Amino acid sequence: MFANAPRGRDISPMSFAPVLDDLPLKKSATVREFERRIAPASDAQLEAMAKHSRALTLQNFGRTMRLFAPLYLSNECINNCRYCGFSRDNPILRVTLELDQVIAEARHLAAQGFRQVLLVAGEHPKFVSGTYLSDCVRALAEDFSSISIEVGPMETEEYVPVVAAGAEALVVYQETYDRQIYAEMHTSGPKRDFNWRLDCPVRGYEAGFRRIGIGALFGLARWQDEAVALAEHIEYLLKRCWQAQISVSLPRLRPAAGSFQPAFTMSDRELAQLICALRITFPQVGIVLSTRERASLRDALVSLGVTMMSAGSHTEPGGYTRQGTENLHHTVRGRIVAPEFDGGADQLATGQFEISDDRAPAEIANLLRGRGLEPVWKDWEQALLAS
């Protein structure tokens, strides 16, 4: 199923691609066991899995929950992705924050307690260059103990100065591991190259990132197939990038500009089962839960195996402090076009997708304490690298 689609550029000898293309016929023993854990289960079986998952999470991570916030730098993008609000041909309000505006957004997050931030941007080298990204990281490094980036895939040597500036984690989602569906979803732009994206985590590891985050966007393909491929990818990275901490995110599609309708669904029960299956199969891998999910579901899932949560999120550049409103525009074939409204004071850039859990970070922290979990705003000190 995964092999019958375009390959893109040449595959490196150490690529995950050959392993992926052997699915579903060839699976490791670990992944076969994982596949059994995501098969339809009775209530009693699922409760037993949940109990096991909770115990393993407590054993490996303690009674803690890392909290982070995404900081969107730009919603410019040269890719056309059918499901994404930032897709190039969507007539949305766009902006790329200037450095002082990025700092203002970051200081707002720091004032709320965050010391872990994820810098996010659409893929557009004209607006989000490696130099711009390094400058943003360097400007925030003093106030944030952990800076992660989620941007378009880059070459190893392009990541090196970003790491040197202070970034310690790279996040890149394959979106879907089904090559055919991937080709259908990504109609133009460099993101069409499946293998280039697939091997991005390894390039980041070779550049010096100490944390690597991957994931699939559930709703593009059958969730069980995505989960098996994701498990194979986790197992591969645990061996190939053995000095890095590996984490996995399990986002489900949310409404966004363009009004894409997912062809596949994943129920709350199935999401809970997947979290438990991942925790039992990979006890030391981090599991991330975003504000895509509604508050009541996030509250129910925090004790199952999740180790990291976003809180109080905005998915539009400048969303926390209304930065960049004076520079809002449309982008048409690389050209900046003025919007039709007068001024930008009452407008914000368009977000990537709709948020479901809009509770304030302090409210999330109090909820966690009520569940016997300690919210962790900071769990890493860059100075340790120099000691």
What are these regions (language model features)?
Residues 53, 81, 119, 172, ...:
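Conserved, mostly hydrophobic/aromatic
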Residues 1-44, 239-387:
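Auxiliary Fe-S-binding modules of radical SAM enzymes
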Residues 88-105, 109-205, 210-220, 242-249:
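Core AdoMet radical
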Residues 59-101:
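Canonical Radical SAM [4Fe-4S] cluster-binding loop centered on the CxxxCxxC motif
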Residues 155-164, 210, 221-236, 294-304:
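Catalytic cores of alpha/beta
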Residues 69, 106, 133-137, 159, ...:
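Generic structural signal for well-ordered alpha-helices
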